[in-house]
Amino acid sequence: MKRIVLTAMTIAMALTATAQQYSFTFVPAGRTDTVLYIGRYYRDAVTLVDTAHAKGGRYVFKGRRDWPRGLYALVAQDGKKTVADFCIDGSRKFTISGDATLKAESVTVKGCKANSQMFTYIATENAAKREVDSLRALKKDEATREAAEAAEKRVIERMGAFEATACHPKNPNVFFDLQNACEPPEVPEEVEDKNTYYRMHYWDSLFAAPLGTLRPTLLHSPQLFSKMNYFFFGMLYYAASDTISAEVDRLMARIGDDTALARYVLDFIEPRYFRSTKNVGWDAVWCHIASEYYLKGRCPWALPGTITNMRYNYNRIKQSIIGAHGQELWMADTNQSADPNDWISSHRFPTPYVILWFWDPDCHHCQEQSEELKKLYDGMVARGEKRFEVYAVGYESDVAKWKRYVKEHKFNWVNVGGTNVNIDYQEAYNVHGAPTMIILDWHRDIIMNKVLPAKNIMSFLDEYEKKQGVVREY
């Protein structure tokens, strides 16, 4: 037992001996926090890793530790709000002073060239932005427009030269290394499809960087998270699911065997596509990510339980994504016949479209949406222009209540419900709440799996037919 204790003590002493002594002092004038923290970034989270208590307006973090080179956050006493970012790069003893928020223009740095350069860069950028903003009003006035545009051009050229010098690869500074690795692409003037070019070259700067040495720094930087988050949930927010899935594949192909970077990306985007209930097509993107990466064993970090749950959800969701063939339901109508020969099919209507409407008479939102859908349906029938049938499934265990509601509100479409049904429609169409809307086309393939306001249904069908090159004959 003594040998074990001595061995543990020896290891601890060795680790302490190899760790570097550090002293990081922050002097934010007028700040009243009793304590500040140092936080380390990872994706959209900041983990608190060190603490300093206020003494005479100074916050001194000191001790022995191996600090990885990178960008860190100085965090307020609430443990959430970032006061300012700073570098740990080379120097292990420095002082950063400034106003209460350490605004870049107010900051002075002693003992750390990297931090001095970073705050100077940010202050210069901020000043240039203020110059450009001040010229906006002048550009609107015809009398001053030409001079304002010329002045703006000079500011942009000046900043371009400044950035080229500051961010030059020969300038060893972790902040500039991160800026270069996450720099957006420049689109040549002669390129016609600028949006596509920008998207196709979006990740070039990252993979031009020396990932072997820079990877740990990148993974713990706000720059990489911002770049990734903007790409998937900014640029591609309204993109078709096929486009998003293709971009996931392109990025993962470039990442290759870099497990740390693959995990950084996939474990961030996967749950966000999974949880989305409003974005059309995101469930298909999630199914693609799940099937191509997690379920094929390409995510070695994923726990067995995670994979089991993902496989269950994948098998459940894939049946109702856009493009899947809708499963045919046979259900009893309000007569509630137990004879399957009397049941009504969800597919066998002469109309080119079928709207599967899963609703609950006790659901206020269902009531409102059903009334709007009824107005659209009745008006369409009255005009003799029946583009779709509504196959309304009563999502209610109290059959008598459901039948009474249908009768009182004069729902003249196809009303089905109860337990007389050929398959579990909740599993077939991923119905786990009401209302749920599924629109089937003439092949009875799913073309929409989100609830559309009734006023938007006709325009959606028009747009769908336009994309399919269909000429209406009804």
Task: Map each language-model feature to its residues.
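Thiol/disulfide oxidoreductase modules built on the thioredoxin-like
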Residues: V421-E463
